[in-house]
Amino acid sequence: MPLREAAERVVEAETVVVLTGAGASADSGIPTFRGKDGLWNKYDPRELATPEAFARDPEKVWEWYLWRRRKIAEAEPNPAHTVLARMERDGLLEAVITQNVDGLHQRAGSRRVIELHGNIWRDECVSCEYQRVNDPERGEGLEYDELPPRCPECGDPLRPGVVWFGEPLPSDALVEAENLARSCDVMLVIGTSGEVRPAADLPLVAKSCGATLIEINPSETALSPHMDVIIRERAASAMEALWNEIERLL
């Protein structure tokens, strides 16, 4: 039974780390990007998620991100988020490394979250170092008087605090994630297609350092051939079931 084996590996491990992708938030109603119903099948990322797109039409890009923010603000963390937060509280999980920008891990109670692709709730100035993080529960960052919004420090445009196609990942987040990958005994890989690098390299780094890899995904991924344990379920139901198995072992 993959669930039983996964639970045993987690309980026996000294250091467990998780890598999450869009599938972890899918059961919260957040659309994924890839797959047959993915956002990139409906929208062209070159028109919405690149520095060139923002330079060409910042209002259009902001309208897209405000639409996504409103979708996320309506969502609630699902068991894929809440179980991970519980595991961290109980000393069973070192950190969450996420490709997601929705902040649902933090809303569920996770404390150590490494955001590889930024945070959709953050506004950043294109010119100076000004940035702010909006609180959706207080209605912040859901609409602006003008698009693009302007920096209160220098007056230049603000942009969403996410990593766009063609941009490097934040170096501090990537270094922390790589260090966690090298030091963990078990890496749970939840809801990621394994197609976006360098995030997709992290499980391979962990494996090369002796870690057990556990994949939770309803579909086969580019990383599946490297996995030691595979749970072919959606993230929310799989994490609920995994937690039940873990509790039996504690």
UniProtKB/Swiss-Prot annotation:
One of its GO terms (molecular function) is histone deacetylase activity, NAD-dependent. It is an enzyme of class 2 (transferase). Keywords: Cytoplasm, Metal-binding, NAD, Transcription, Transcription regulation, Transferase, Zinc. Zn(2+) binds at residues 125, 128, 151, 154. Binds 1 zinc ion per subunit. InterPro entries: DHS-like_NAD/FAD-binding_dom, NAD-dep_sirtuin_deacylases, Sirtuin, Sirtuin_cat_small_dom_sf, Sirtuin_class_III, Ssirtuin_cat_dom. Its main location: cytoplasm. Residues 1-250 form the Deacetylase sirtuin-type domain. It catalyses: N(6)-acetyl-L-lysyl-[protein] + NAD(+) + H2O = 2''-O-acetyl-ADP-D-ribose + nicotinamide + L-lysyl-[protein]; N(6)-succinyl-L-lysyl-[protein] + NAD(+) + H2O = 2''-O-succinyl-ADP-D-ribose + nicotinamide + L-lysyl-[protein]. The active site is at residue 117. Its cofactor is Zn(2+). Substrate binds at residues 65, 68. Its EC number is 2.3.1.286. CDD domains: SIRT5_Af1_CobB. NAD(+) binds at residues 21-40, 99-102, 191-193, 217-219, 235. One of its GO terms (cellular component) is cytoplasm. It is found in: Cytoplasm. It comes from the Archaea. Belongs to the sirtuin family. Class III subfamily. NAD-dependent lysine deacetylase and desuccinylase that specifically removes acetyl and succinyl groups on target proteins. Modulates the activities of several proteins which are inactive in their acylated form. Deacetylates the N-terminal lysine residue of Alba, the major archaeal chromatin protein and that, in turn, increases Alba's DNA binding affinity, thereby repressing transcription. 2 residues (Tyr-65 and Arg-68) present in a large hydrophobic pocket are probably involved in substrate specificity. They are important for desuccinylation activity, but dispensable for deacetylation activity. This is NAD-dependent protein deacylase. It comes from Methanopyrus kandleri (strain AV19 / DSM 6324 / JCM 9639 / NBRC 100938). The gene is cobB.
